[in-house]
C-alpha cells in the first residue's frame, strides 16, 4: 500500500517537473521575455496620462472597452504571457473594467486561435467562439467595474488630458513597441498556420528564430540611438521587477496544473462533460479555468475530448475558460489586484463561460 502511495506521489512529481520543462521551451521563454520587455516599456516609456485617457475608469465605456478588447485580441498569447502586460497597464492607471477586458481578450479573442478552432473543430464552432469571446470579455470587464465601483472611485486619478503617448517623437515610440510586438508574434506563430516561419535552417534552429534575432538587433540598435542610457536602465529595471513578481508564480501554477492533469485524466473528464447540461458546462468551465493551455494547444486537446464524448456546449465552455485563465493566472492576478478581485474574476470567467457553453450547445446540437 505504501509503495502504491509513493509511486502515485512520485508520478505526480514527475509529471509536474516534465510539465515545467515542456513549458520552458525556447519559443515560450522568448515569448515571455518579449512580454516582460513590452510590459516594462509600457511602465517606463508610456505617458501615464495617455493610458488613463483610453483605459481609465472615467473614459467613456465605448472607447475604453473597445480599445481594451481590440488591443488584447491583436496579441496571439496565452493566459500567462498576457499577465505582465495586464499588470503594467493596471499599474499605470487603467480602470479595473478595461484592464480585465484586456486580460481576458488577449488569450480568448486570439485571432489565430479563432481560425485554428474553425479549421479543426468546424466553422460554426469557430464563429461562435469569436462572438462569445468578445461578448464575455466586455461583460467581465463591466461586471468587475460594477462590483468594485467604490474601490475604483478611490483609485481613480483626476489627471489632465494627455495628447501625447510619450515625450519623444511618435514614430520612435511606435517603432519601439512595434518591433517588440512583431517579435512576439513571430516567436509564437503556429507552425500549422504559418509553416514557412517554422522552416528548419539548422538543427532545431528555425526561420522564425533567425527573424527574431534580426528584429532583436534592429530593436537594440534603434533603442541605443533614440533612448538615453537612463531611460534604457529604467525600461530594463521595470521589466525585471515584473519578472521577479510574475515568473515564480507562473512556474508554481504550471506545476500545479500538471499535477491536476495527472490526477484527473482527460478520459475521466469526458465522462462528466457529455451532453449539454448546466452541470456539464460548469465542470468544463471550472476545469478549464484551473488548467493551463499554451497558445493554440486547447484546440487539439478539446478535439480529442470531443472524440471521447464531450458535448459541443462543454467544449465551447472549455474553449472560452481554458485559454483565458489558469492557476498561474489566478495566482498572479491576486498579487496585482488582491485575492478578492482575483477570485471574483475567476468566478465571472466560469459563470459566463458556462452560460455561453450552454447556449452554444442549444444552437449547435
From Swiss-Prot:
What's in the GO CC field? plasma membrane
Q: What is its main location?
A: membrane
Tell me which domain of life the UniProt entry assigns to the organism this sequence originates from: Archaea
Work out whether the entry's keyword set contains Membrane. Answer: yes
State which residue ranges cross the membrane: 6-26, 32-52, 67-87, 108-128, 130-150, 174-194, 201-221, 245-265, 282-302, 308-328, 344-364
Q: Which InterPro entries match?
A: DUF318
Listed A to Z, the keywords are:
Cell membrane, Membrane, Transmembrane, Transmembrane helix
Q: How does this protein sit in the membrane?
A: Multi-pass membrane protein
Q: Where in the cell is it found?
A: Cell membrane
Family per record: Belongs to the UPF0718 family.
Q: Output this protein's name.
A: UPF0718 protein MJ0584
